Amino acid sequence: LTMMARKMKETDSEEEIREAFRVFDKDGNGFISAAELRHVMTNLGEKLTDEEVDEMIREADIDGDGQVNYEEFVAMMTSK
């Protein structure tokens, strides 16, 4: 039973992460750009400078392509 609950919890958080990624990935291309990140953060009431947004992208952008893909997003969300 504990194992089942743990599995459901994992699935739940995976689905939440997937949903969060969809919110950020406005154009649905599978990547979060700096512009998309800025847009969502602004809607959440966060006033960030371009430098702050770029820094957030750099921190999450493991492969260095300037965007955050789903795998990078998951790594960022689960690293805490």
UniProtKB/Swiss-Prot annotation:
It holds the Pfam family EF-hand_7. Residues 12-47, 48-80 form the EF-hand domain. Ca(2+) 3 binds at D25, D27, N29, E36. One of its GO terms (cellular component) is cytoplasm. GO terms for molecular function: calcium ion binding; enzyme regulator activity. Keywords: Calcium, Metal-binding, Repeat. Gene3D superfamilies: EF-hand. SUPFAM superfamilies: EF-hand. Ca(2+) 4 binds at D61, D63, D65, Q67, E72. It comes from the Eukaryota. The keyword Calcium applies. InterPro entries: CALM/Myosin/TropC-like (IPR050230), EF-hand-dom_pair (IPR011992), EF_Hand_1_Ca_BS (IPR018247), EF_hand_dom (IPR002048). One of its GO terms (biological process) is microtubule cytoskeleton organization. Coiled coil: none annotated. Belongs to the calmodulin family. Calmodulin mediates the control of a large number of enzymes, ion channels and other proteins by Ca(2+). Among the enzymes to be stimulated by the calmodulin-Ca(2+) complex are a number of protein kinases and phosphatases. This is Calmodulin. It comes from Strongylocentrotus purpuratus (Purple sea urchin).
